[in-house]
Curated annotation (Swiss-Prot):
Listed name of the protein: Sodium- and chloride-dependent taurine transporter
Organism: Homo sapiens (Human)
Lineage: Eukaryota, Metazoa, Chordata, Craniata, Vertebrata
Cytoplasmic topological domain: 1-49, 564-620
Transmembrane segments: 50-70, 78-97, 122-142, 218-236, 245-262, 298-315, 327-348, 381-400, 430-448, 465-485, 506-525, 545-563
Reaction it catalyzes: 4-aminobutanoate(out) + chloride(out) + 2 Na(+)(out) = 4-aminobutanoate(in) + chloride(in) + 2 Na(+)(in); taurine(out) + chloride(out) + 2 Na(+)(out) = taurine(in) + chloride(in) + 2 Na(+)(in); beta-alanine(out) + chloride(out) + 2 Na(+)(out) = beta-alanine(in) + chloride(in) + 2 Na(+)(in); hypotaurine(out) + chloride(out) + 2 Na(+)(out) = hypotaurine(in) + chloride(in) + 2 Na(+)(in)
Glycosylation sites: N163, N179, N190
Free-text activity regulation comment from the record: Taurine transport activity is stimulated by thyrotropin. Taurine transport activity is inhibited by GABA, hypotaurine and beta-alanine.
Recorded superkingdom: Eukaryota
GO molecular function: alanine transmembrane transporter activity; amino acid transmembrane transporter activity; amino acid:sodium symporter activity; gamma-aminobutyric acid transmembrane transporter activity; gamma-aminobutyric acid:sodium:chloride symporter activity; taurine transmembrane transporter activity; taurine:sodium symporter activity
Stated family: Belongs to the sodium:neurotransmitter symporter (SNF) (TC 2.A.22) family. SLC6A6 subfamily.
Chain spans, region Disordered: 1-42
Gene Ontology CC: apical plasma membrane; basolateral plasma membrane; cell projection; dendrite; GABA-ergic synapse; membrane; microvillus membrane; neuronal cell body
Length: 620
């Protein structure tokens, strides 16, 4: 059969299962319910909905508070070398892979792998475990940001001075550092900053350790409840509501980041901060940790291996040119990370000059930047209340759209397992409320007096780079060596009208697996047990709990392989062959098309059904 005829068969094969679904609940059509057919899934109402949702999903807190710090720590401009190697060798290929298999199969993060390779459907379960754990702790950052935002609506910022009930006799205002003679005299004593005391003694009420959980912080618990409610109402109606919310949440942070960038560049000391950020140190490339940081940053910032991008792609129309937009979104994501460094380090340079210290003494990453370094910087600027409100609104919006996109990915992956049940009526909305409630209750462990230790345990292990690298390796291995990169390229050509360059295919087959394995091994070799603030050492039971969180996702892949082999009858090699064969996209839709035979290469009791590219071949 000619290539054009094969592609026409693919087009006919998909035309029914990829229609939009204007039902009363996302993905449900009344006529489907009446006829007893599985509900069809909805689609994005416009292309911009998808673009903004993806942009909001992966342009988040890591772009602002993690990339700039890693860049300065790992050799400044020299860090961009391993960063771009991992970007083009693994980040963009895996990002596009997840989007395109979602679009091609019209399925979420679990069921797409059920169709592509049932034996390795554990990839989807691993992704859902990771994103479920991530959703529990990531939103706690937004609860902290909400608390800081509320505290910013005061004439005087509460972390600017030492005259509050939570301050200790050792509190020393940062303005004292300007007087170097006074500072040298008192620096031998253990004095602390009012910003640190506000963070540790007011916001966290930090306990001595993880084995001292203390009482619940009700103010933070209410902030956590508030952000979960916002997240719920942003996604409860499916992608048609999510696609509209991101018009604001995904664009407004860029405007505020631009304002902060302009303000930072006009401050004294900004030039020194930017030089510190980008000054290259090529010798740092000899350290394997630099390459590990580059690889893990790519996977974190592109939100891959979480099932979220696959779920977002599954709502695309079949003919949507996602390849073009994935490349543009990649430029946006990495460009935002790079520009954020100018905004952050210009302000850190100003703060270092004001305090008369080295920039290395004020540079922070993660929560240390968001809740210590930057709040301290705004107290030294004119109109500190205004800049504090602006910063924490930006932080909230950056985190919120990432959060509800990841929750949407989690929900879509789970709903697609039982579409006939969970897409009827208001069951999907009830299920979302249930998932959000459980996640909120688990998150309460992180807003106790010992909650910061629990938060760091989740952050260090549950969604660590090791887990993401593990999933990425199997994704590429299955597509390149089992399903076949050329077979997927056939589907891509049918969807977007042309075949992408071979770069993607070679990356899936060789480059990405090699980078993942190398980074995975070095991560284990360079592993350092978790500490808090470089002083508190976690007990052994907590370290064991952390590794249990990491293994809970990683073990899904081999565990599902064993379960599937045990559940399937027949000789071992026959079972393996059967489980490595893709399944039909949607049996009822296919049968309506009358495309038969499906089981011309049946392995067991007529149960084996070929994927679309094999079905086309049988119709020659």
């Amino acid at each position: 059969m000619a290539t054009k005829e094969k592609l026409q068969c693919l087009k006919d094969f998909h035309k029914d299962i990829l229609k939009p679904s204007p039902g009363k609940s996302p993905g449900t059509r009344p006529e489907d319910e009446a006829e007893g057919k599985p509900p069809q899934r909805e689609k994005w109402s416009s292309k911009i909905d998808f673009v903004l949702s993806v942009a909001g999903g992966f342009v988040g807190l890591g772009n602002v508070w993690r990339f700039p710090y890693l860049c300065y720590k790992n050799g400044g401009g020299a860090f961009l070398i391993p960063y771009f190697i991992f970007l083009f060798g693994s980040g963009l290929p895996v990002f596009f892979l997840e989007i395109i298999i979602g679009q091609y199969t019209s399925e979420g993060g679990i069921t797409c792998w059920e169709k592509i390779c049932p034996l390795f459907s554990g990839i989807g379960y691993a992704s859902v475990v990771i994103v479920s754990l991530l959703n529990v702790y990531y939103i706690v950052i937004l609860a902290w940001a909400t608390y800081y935002l509320f505290q910013s609506f005061q004439k005087e910022l509460p972390w600017a001075h030492c005259n509050h009930s939570w301050n200790t006799p050792h509190c020393m205002e940062d303005t004292m550092r300007k007087n170097k003679s006074v500072w040298i005299t008192i620096s031998s004593t253990n004095f602390t900053s009012p910003v640190i005391e506000f963070w540790e003694r007011n916001v966290l009420s930090l306990s001595p350790g993880i084995d001292h959980p203390g009482s619940l912080k009700w103010d933070l618990a209410l902030c956590l409840l508030l952000v979960w409610l916002v997240c719920f109402f942003c996604i409860w109606k499916g992608v048609r509501s999510t696609g509209k919310v991101v018009y604001f949440t995904a664009t407004f942070p860029f405007a505020m980041l631009l304002v902060l960038l302009v303000r930072g560049l006009t401050l004294p000391g900004a030039g020194a901060g930017i030089k510190f950020y980008l000054y290259p140190d090529i010798t740092r490339l000899e350290d394997p940790q630099v390459w590990i940081d580059a690889g893990t940053q790519i996977f974190f910032s592109y939100a891959i291996c979480l099932g979220a991008m696959t779920s977002l792609g599954s709502y695309n129309k079949y003919k949507y040119n996602s390849y073009r937009d994935c490349m543009l979104l990649g430029c946006l994501n990495s460009g935002t990370s790079f520009v954020s460094g100018f905004a952050i380090f210009s302000i850190l340079g100003f703060m270092a000059q004001e305090q008369g210290v080295d920039i290395a003494d004020v540079a922070e990453s993660g929560p240390g930047l968001a809740f210590i370094a930057y709040p301290k910087a705004v107290t030294m600027m004119p109109l500190p209340t205004f800049w504090s409100i602006l910063f924490f609104i930006m932080l909230l919006l950056l985190g919120l759209d990432s959060q509800f996109v990841e929750v949407e990915g989690q929900i879509t992956s789970l709903v697609d397992l039982y579409p006939s049940f969970l897409r009827k009526g208001y069951r999907r909305e009830i299920f979302i409320a249930f998932v959000c409630s459980i996640s909120y209750l688990l998150g309460l462990t992180m807003v106790t007096e010992g909650g910061m230790y629990v938060f760091q345990l989740f952050d260090y292990y549950a969604a660590s780079g090791v887990c993401l690298l593990w999933v990425a390796f199997f994704e590429c291995f299955v597509i390149a060596w089992i399903y076949g990169g050329d077979n997927l390229y056939d589907g891509i050509e049918d969807m977007i009208g042309y075949r992408p360059g071979p770069w993607m295919k070679y990356s899936w087959a060789v480059i990405t697996p090699v980078l993942c394995v190398g980074c995975f091994i070095f991560s284990l070799v360079k592993y350092v047990p978790l500490t808090y603030n470089k002083t508190y050492v976690y007990p052994n039971w907590a370290i064991g709990l952390g590794w249990s969180l990491a293994l809970s996702s990683m073990l899904c892949v081999p565990l599902v392989i064993v379960i599937r082999l045990c559940q399937t009858e027949g000789p071992f090699l026959v079972r393996v062959k059967y489980l490595l064969t893709p399944r039909e996209p949607n049996r009822w839709a296919v049968e309506r098309e009358g495309a038969t035979p499906y089981n011309s290469r049946t392995v067991m009791n007529g149960a084996l059904v070929k994927p679309t590219h094999i079905i086309v071949e049988t119709m020659m």
